[in-house]
Amino acid sequence: MASQTVTERLRELAETVGVSTGFWDWYGNWKHVEDASLVAVLNSLGFSLSSEPSHGEIDEAFRHNEDLVWLAPLPPTTVCRQGNEAEIPVHVPHGMGVWCHVETEDGQHHELQQLDRWIPPRMVDGNLIGRATFKIPNWLPLGWHRIVARHEDGSECSSTLVVVPQRLSSRLDDGHKRWGVAAQLYSTRSSGSWGMGDTQDLADLAAIVARNGANFLQINPLHAPQPGFPQENSPYLPVSRRWASPLYIRPEAIDEYVHMDSKERGVVTRYAHASRSHEDIVDRDLSWKSKIKALRKIFELPRSISRQAQFERFCAQGGESLENFALWSALVFENGDIDLPERYASIDAPGVEQARQRLASEIEFWQWCQWIVFDQLIRAQEGARRLGMDMGIMSDLAVGVHSKGSEIWSMPDAFAPGMSVGAPPDMYSQQGQNWAQPPWSPRSLAQMGYAPLRDMLRSVLSYAGAVRIDHILGLFRLWWIPEGMGAQAGAYVSYDHEAMVGIVLLEAQRAGAVVIGEDLGTVEPWVRGYLNDRGILGTSVLWFEKDGGGWPLWPDHYRRSCLAAVTTHDLPPTLGYLEGAHTELRNELGLLVEDLDQVRDADRIERERMVSRLREGGFIHEDDPSEEELVLAMHAYLAASPALLLAVSLVDVVGEKLPQNLPGTNAEYPNWCVPLHAFNGKEVLIDDMAHCDRVKRFLTSVDRYIR
């Protein structure tokens, strides 16, 4: 057998540690990942390879990778399903006795049985290391536990044990179909909004849709943006996914506001008016500039004993994570830019601890902002549930965070250095995509006991009865792009999906929440099957569900375990789509690379096929249905499918035509800044929706379809 080349050996190393050495392109061709990309990705995972590694270097990397397992007394984290037995290796100096037990989160103590299994010892760094294998029983309770190894010399070590559900148990287990409304909260304003939709608008919108039979209100991610200016418009590029955006606070709904005298209230009212000067756009900078002034005034007001106790409890629960987020916020706001100077560049930078003392009051302000926004979100959810929504708010979880955000500042070890997340080339983006978001390091996550994932989920689920995970494939693998290379020069890196999905299930089940995974696009078939088996719903969009001939898929061929929708935030509202407004808009902006007439023809054929399906299925009967009748018929079509959840976009309810987001654009279009408009081009306020015949007619029709 011929010896392997350096490239072959490098690829073997990559595959061993979960780095794919190739991928299928959109033409169905297998594309190899270049050696330089593999070296960069491997080094980000903790190896130390030169740019052109030798056989000896790669052999040493293999040994190092194997030695790491033996040098760890216990695996950093063990995740197992309840009801399944598992085994855990324990490493000790060869010949030393060792005993293991589990300490459950509620304080119980369970000794583990050592298996009668001989595994030859291994020489590591001149020391002979032995391995003992212990059995984890199948009857341990769900939860976050500790495995403790006790050595005969009296020393101890421990690691994380997470027992997770086999399958998520949720309210959907009753088999009943449910529906709800999907809205971009920032765009859904009222006469009381500060230039953008907020928590009070969320509560009021939930009340409107609940009265008409909706079971949930799906919204955009509410993750934290940077505290200063300019504000990031995209809700999918936060600085932290654990903490929330104070832009969504309604100042007048803060309990302490009622204690303001008339003069102080007048000042707050003027701030509110100043935030509303842009009626045709959602101006986050303008809104935040006014709102933060009001928040600082309210922050200075005295709090009752019980309110102060609630604030202190929130800070204690948030712990170091909240304090560090608040410290980072204070530093960035003081600096006036998200690019901090060297003395504050990371949590362990030389000036940080001194700043922590100097900015104590400012840190408390940013902690208080988090307390207020979470308090208002939780109240909105409680109100929705009281009105009969069995899920209430369905929040959204973004793929990642800003490369200069608070998460990478405060826990840099959790992220893969020198890497960015994106997507390989496809027919829509032939150079690939770079999302400028650092990926979590799979090895670091395990070392940290998956605490970042757990804490993020707990925060989001504290105010939501359901969560949609954007790009859920990211729990299985992500496209890593080395710094300085093009998006096409990346590689897929695998994550321990069994552990990560299991933790999602555990936290969701404890919160009584439903989980939906956004699994649109290219997803390996086994992934959808795996998620379905674990109780996570997929996502189906009417325009994307086609049969082999390119016709709309018949309703009875849809998945049962999914959230079905006619459109999404990355597509135009249905009226705009039916009119081809998205094509005309892209043409006007000079973004259309295909022939305009050909694209118009393709749009026309797609519309005609949809109308034909609707007629053939008996969903429309009129020769010339109105726009509203046509859009309703499309929702009736989806309601006839087995899909457990149906999401109705608020833009379709009111007859909006403008898209919220035009993928592939930046300055060309005001993405994520378009206020909600009706079919007549006028802005629709929540105040109007409460008494709007069209809104009531649309929602009650959908409720009738589902029931």
Stretches with model-predicted labels:
Residues 43-83, 87-114, 118-150, 163-411:
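Acidic/aromatic-lined carbohydrate-recognition and catalytic surfaces
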Residues 211, 343, 621-622, 698-707:
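Domain-scale activation on soluble regions of proteins
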Residues 1-48:
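Basic helix-extension-helix modules of the SAP/HeH family
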Residues 655-707:
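Structured C-terminal cap/extension of enzyme domains
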Residues 228-374, 400-647, 651-652, 667-668, ...:
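Alpha-amylase-like alpha-glycosidases and glucanotransferases acting on alpha-linked glucans and related
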Residues 24, 171, 191, 402-403, ...:
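Short helix/loop capping segments that flank catalytic or ligand/cofactor-binding pockets
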